[in-house]
């Protein structure tokens, strides 16, 4: 953009040339200094036409604005005889003809594209119809899809059931382990209690083992009962010495079951009386040592009587 301006003196005409490739934009006209009240009527001449563009006066309109564009040569003049008139504006590059041709070609292309759009619209309608048919075809196979969905649901249910079975098995395994732990604890406590029971002592006289007693557990108040085995009595030379074993009294004549194992009733104690007889006095003793002790005592008694 280039600024432009000129002075038109009284009674004269000025030619204006925008220049090649430019247009001239007339923006403003102003009246010069004047001592008298004077009016100036302005004219523009293009080719053979002369046009009035405005009037300037010292009192009312000393200047006036325009919005006029010229793309070729023109002439400016006014009617004032005492003062000059000043015109201002600017020049702008004019668009080339090639650009205009491009714009025209674009317009033509747009006009040509209109029927193509219609044809494409028809083709699009055909495509839409074909797509609708394609959509309708899978809709017929919807039962198959439903069956597949049902199969998937059944598979999921089976997996859920299997998971639940696994959790149940794990719970049962834990419960069985806990039961084993409890039973092992009970066995340990029973072993400890059996260790607490006194063991029978061997008799000083004789080599024969005394009768063993068994321990029974009675369900009194959900507690384990203990049966103490008595120690064997010393027979130190007494006649008819025998070991007395305390036998537990069974509850209501029934055997007690512990850990799915029945406990047998205790063995009967051996009868009193020995197996070695004394011929002179027809007495029997448990062992030969007892018989020898008896014979010694008898011999001592006879010697004391003789003395």
UniProtKB/Swiss-Prot annotation:
Region of interest (Disordered), ranges: 98-280
Keywords: Chromatin regulator, Hydrolase, Metal-binding, Nucleus, Phosphoprotein, Repressor, Transcription, Transcription regulation, Zinc, Zinc-finger
GO molecular function: hydrolase activity; zinc ion binding
Primary subcellular site in the record, as a coarse category: nucleus
Keyword Protease: no
Protein localization: Nucleus, Nucleolus
Post-translational modification as stated in the protein's UniProt record: The N-terminus is blocked. Phosphorylated. Required for enzyme activity.
ZnF locations on chain (C2H2-type): 276-299
Job of this protein: Mediates the deacetylation of lysine residues on the N-terminal part of the core histones (H2A, H2B, H3 and H4). Histone deacetylation gives a tag for epigenetic repression and plays an important role in transcriptional regulation, cell cycle progression and developmental events. Able to deacetylate all 4 core histones.
The protein, known as: Histone deacetylase HDT1
Source organism: Zea mays (Maize)
